[in-house]
Amino acid sequence: MANVLQTEQIAPASRIRAATLGAALTVLVLAGGLIASFMVSSATFQALDGRVPGSLTFTLAVLVFSASTLFSSALWGLGMAHLAQVPASWRMAWAGILGFVPITLLLIFGLQAAEPIVFRTNLPLHRVFTVLFVPSAALIAGTSSLALGWALGWGRAAPALALRVGLTAALAFLAVNLGMEALGWQVGGPGAAERATMLTVLFVSNLGAALAGGAMLGMTLAQRH
């Protein structure tokens, strides 16, 4: 078991293919699965609301969301196993689930709790957004990569993988965030509510983070020996 993150040189075409597949898997399966889970869960809640007791409606919506998210996370782990050229296994599926779902839920609740504290710092709203969500992108990407590294038996090389992918995702999120801000999409700025600026910037920045982080992860998995 190696203790450092060593990679082998592969052809540029293979490197591009691995990066593209890693980005596609992360955007379509992992991030896309989370969005689809929210949509299906919301549709379930709306379809059942008023027809069955409220507590049952909420429970069923949560179950639908959970099942969909768990499935997409497991599928992502299996896809990354293919990129790493190892047999698809329950171990990799569980790595996909445990690396993504707990940290995502923790950050959702943690950000809600931290929001009033951060607002008391009197920072502009667009800076509060950046301070909260750039580290969140790093944590989600890093934790997901760490779980995959451990499942692959990389030992102490797994944290190096997590750091590489986490920083890549965070920098991509920050670049997109600041780029949109320069183009007039400033969170909390003039007309922000009418254009749903916060949701739009969050979605596009997360998309950038998923693309960059997934590409880095896919390329590293393909090169690792």
Which residues make up each language-model segment?
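Juxtamembrane/disordered regions of integral membrane proteins
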Residues: 2-225
